[in-house]
C-alpha cells in the first residue's frame, strides 16, 4: 500500500517565492555594468520614441533653408576678348560719345535724321549752359599779364571767340518763331543770350570789334521778331507782364544803345495795347490806364465807353 502512494514533490524555489511573497520580485543586484546594447534594444527604443505621444514633446519651428547661391562657372580656358557694347559705352565720356555719334551721322546720313527726331528738344537752360561753357573757355584762353584788349590778346583768343559766336548764331534761330511757338521761351533765351554778348571782350582796334557789333545787330533783330509775334498772341500778355520793358531797357543801356530799335518796337506794341490815350511808353503817372487783362478780370472793361441808345 505504501508503495502505491506517490511521494509528494517539494515545491520549486521560484514558485515558493511567488506564492509566499505578495510583492513583485526585485531586480537582481548583480547586474553587469558594461553589458552591451543589442540592435534589438535600439530598435525597440526607436519604436517607442516614434510611438510616444507628441503632446509633451517640444514644438519644432520650421527653418527656412538658405537660398542657393549662384556662382558663375569659371571659364576653363582664359583668353582675351573685347568688351561688350554696354560696357564699352560706360567707359566713354560725353565728348567721346559726341565724337562717335557725329562721325556715325556723317557716314550715314539716314542715321542723322533719326538722331534729330529722337533727341529731346533743347531747353533754354541747356542751350545757355552750352554758351556759358564756350564763354568760360574764351575767358581761360586770355594770356596771363599784359593788356587784355590788345591785338596780341585778340589773336590768342580768336579761335574760342569764333566758337562762341558760331554757337550763338546756331542756337538763336532755334528759339525764334515760327519754330518756337511760346513767346515766354523765346524771351527767356534772348535775355540770357544778350547777357552773354554783354560779356564779350572789347578791343582797342575797331576792326576787332566788328564781330561783337554784328552779334548785337543779330540779337536786336531777334528781339524785334519775338516782340511782334508776342503782340499778336493773347493780346501781348507776355509783354505786359514780366517786366520785359525794364529788362530790354537795361540791355540797351549795357549795349550802348545798339538795341534801341527793339526798345522802340516794344514801346509801340505796349502803346497800342494801352490804347490811343496813353501818354507814351514808360510813363509812370497816377492816371496810368489799367491793362486790358486787368479790366477783363475785374469786370470793368468797356465801362467808360459811351453806348448809343435808340435806333441805329
From Swiss-Prot:
Basic and acidic residues bias: start-end ranges: 38-49
Keywords: Cytoplasm, Nucleus, Protein transport, Transport
Main location group: cytoplasm
A single cellular component GO annotation: nucleus
Annotated Low complexity bias: 20-32
Family annotation (InterPro entries): Cut8/Sts1_fam, Cut8/Sts1_sf
GO biological process, one term: proteasome localization
Subcellular location: Cytoplasm; Nucleus
Pfam families: Cut8
Positions of region (Disordered): 15-83
GO molecular function, one term: proteasome binding
Quaternary structure annotation from Swiss-Prot or TrEMBL: Binds the proteasome.
PANTHER family according to UniProt: FI02826P
Biological role stated in the UniProt entry: Involved in ubiquitin-mediated protein degradation. Regulatory factor in the ubiquitin/proteasome pathway that controls the turnover of proteasome substrates. Targets proteasomes to the nucleus and facilitates the degradation of nuclear proteins.
Family statement: Belongs to the cut8/STS1 family.
Protein name, entry field: Tethering factor for nuclear proteasome sts1
Protein's organism: Aspergillus fumigatus (strain ATCC MYA-4609 / CBS 101355 / FGSC A1100 / Af293)
